[in-house]
UniProtKB/Swiss-Prot annotation:
Enzyme's top EC category: isomerase
Gene3D superfamilies noted in UniProt: Aldolase class I
Record-linked InterPro entries: Aldolase_TIM (IPR013785), TIM_sf (IPR035990), Triosephosphate_isomerase (IPR000652), Triosephosphate_isomerase_AS (IPR020861)
Record-given protein name: L-erythrulose-1-phosphate isomerase
Main location: cytoplasm
Keyword Transit peptide: no
Gene this chain is encoded by: eryH
Pathway: Carbohydrate metabolism; erythritol degradation
Length: 256
């Protein structure tokens, strides 16, 4: 059975002590996990090693929020894929809209990072999404296609067989003031993303939805045919919130 991916990125939040408390509580709840759901957490760099160590006896995957494409070199302030592997990480989040808006991330650099992640055995979680302006001007589908193709553009034919994830996060739906996309809208966009990715990879890859996911909409979202998981923000920064959404989704998945 195909698993649903449900996880959270903490962005620039949580001290090491807070990260440990979250990971320990998640580990304590491990006995109640659903076999249908693949859980993951993406802490800040300062906490990845400790969180991975605490969760090492569970099925929870742990990732990083970004990385450079080079293995090493004169890239002050950057983190390399080798460093992430040295921390025993599983996933790396790439191309988030905040990185694109504030730090000069482009489709080209995302493509370089995706190739480096695959080469080093990391699962790239590729974030894509249109702005409100794109949406209102009718360019959403074109923007998403450009981002998907750019992210996959550096992969060799062999690398195209690697495990790859997409996360659709409409820019207007994320953040504290984000407006959640309707389940129908999200599902339609994700169908387009999956189709474009399949045209490049010759297979279907999972596409998660992220954008103001919360306990009130998670069940409707996870029931959509083209939503293969949820990438949760602030609703899951508290471990009780994450466990609540996991439980709601597990019940919905089992009912289907």
């Amino acid at each position: 059975m195909t698993k649903f991916w449900i996880g959270t990125s903490w962005k620039m939040n949580k001290t090491l002590a807070e990260a440990r408390l979250f990971a320990e509580a998640l580990k304590a709840a491990d006995a109640g996990r659903s076999p249908d759901i693949q859980r993951f957490v993406i802490p800040p760099f300062t906490a990845v090693r400790e969180v991975k160590e605490i969760l090492s006896g569970t099925s929870v995957k742990v990732g990083a929020q970004n990385m450079h494409w080079a293995d090493q070199g004169t890239w002050t302030g950057e983190i390399s894929p080798l460093m992430l592997k040295d921390c025993n990480l599983d996933i790396v989040e790439l191309g988030h809209s905040e990185r694109r808006e504030h730090f000069g991330e482009t489709n080209e650099t995302v493509g370089l990072k995706v190739e480096a992640a695959v080469r080093h055995g990391l699962i790239p979680l590729i974030c894509i999404g249109e702005t409100l302006e794109d949406c209102e001007s009718g360019r959403a589908a074109a923007v998403l296609e450009e981002e998907v193709r750019g992210a996959l553009s550096k992969l060799s034919e062999a690398q195209k067989q690697a495990e790859i994830l997409f996360a659709y996060e409409p820019v207007w739906a994320i953040g504290e003031n984000g407006i959640p996309a309707s389940a129908d809208y999200a599902d339609a966009r994700q169908a387009e993303i999956i189709a474009v990715a399949q045209s490049v990879l010759a297979r279907r890859v999972p596409c998660l939805y992220g954008g103001s996911v919360n306990p009130g909409n998670c069940e409707e979202l996870i029931a959509c045919p083209h939503i293969d998981g949820l990438f949760i923000g602030r609703s899951a920064w508290n471990v009780e919130g994450y466990l609540d959404i996991l439980a709601r989704c597990a019940t919905k998945v089992q009912a289907n």
